[in-house]
C-alpha cells in the first residue's frame, strides 16, 4: 500500500499504529466504516473541519455515532459561532477529501480538539488520509501529534 501523508508523519514520529483498508463501496459513513472494521462505533472517530464567521478554521475529532455540538465547539475555539466547512473547501485547506480527511498531516496546521471520551480508550480509529483507509492508534499519541485539546464537544448519540 502506498503511504499517505498521515502514515508518513506517524512513521517519522515513531508512533505505533495499524492501518486497515476497507471497501469504500460498502459506504463511507462512520457507522459503515465501524461495521466494516467489526468495531464498536465508539472506537471509530470522524474528523470534522469548521469555519468561523472570521474565516478561522478548527478541527474536531468525535466518535462517529455522536454529533458535534456546534455551541460547545465555538466555545472551545473561542469563537462566537462555528459552522461546518463547505465540502468544496476541504481539499484546498486540508489536502484531504471528504470521507478521507485525517486529523494527521493536514496541509494547513489547524487548532484541533478531540472529544474527551477518546482519552479513556486504549486505541481509536481515525481516517488514514484517503477514502478506504483507517488508522488504529493510541489517542494519547494522536493528541501529542496533532497538539489537540481533549474536551467535551459532542451533543448526543445520533446513530447506532
Task: Walk through the language-model features, giving the residues of each.
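Extended, low-hydrophobicity, polar/charged segments
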Residues: 1-160
Amino acid at each position: 500500500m502506498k503511504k499517505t501523508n498521515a502514515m508518513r508523519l506517524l512513521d517519522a514520529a515513531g508512533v505505533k499504529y495499524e492501518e486497515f483498508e476497507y471497501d469504500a463501496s460498502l459506504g463511507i459513513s462512520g457507522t459503515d466504516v465501524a461495521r466494516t472494521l467489526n468495531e464498536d462505533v465508539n472506537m471509530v472517530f470522524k474528523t470534522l473541519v469548521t469555519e468561523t464567521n472570521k474565516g478561522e478554521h478548527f478541527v474536531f475529532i468525535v466518535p462517529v455515532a455522536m454529533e458535534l455540538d456546534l455551541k460547545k465547539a465555538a466555545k472551545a475555539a473561542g469563537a462566537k459561532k462555528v459552522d461546518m466547512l463547505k465540502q468544496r473547501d476541504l481539499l484546498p485547506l486540508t489536502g484531504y477529501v471528504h470521507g478521507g480527511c485525517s486529523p494527521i498531516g493536514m496541509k494547513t496546521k489547524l487548532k484541533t480538539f478531540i472529544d474527551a471520551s477518546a482519552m479513556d480508550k486504549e486505541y481509536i480509529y481515525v481516517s488514514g488520509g484517503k477514502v478506504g483507509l483507517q488508522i488504529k492508534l493510541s489517542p494519547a499519541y494522536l493528541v501529542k501529534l496533532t497538539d489537540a485539546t481533549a474536551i467535551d464537544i459532542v451533543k448526543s448519540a445520533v446513530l447506532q
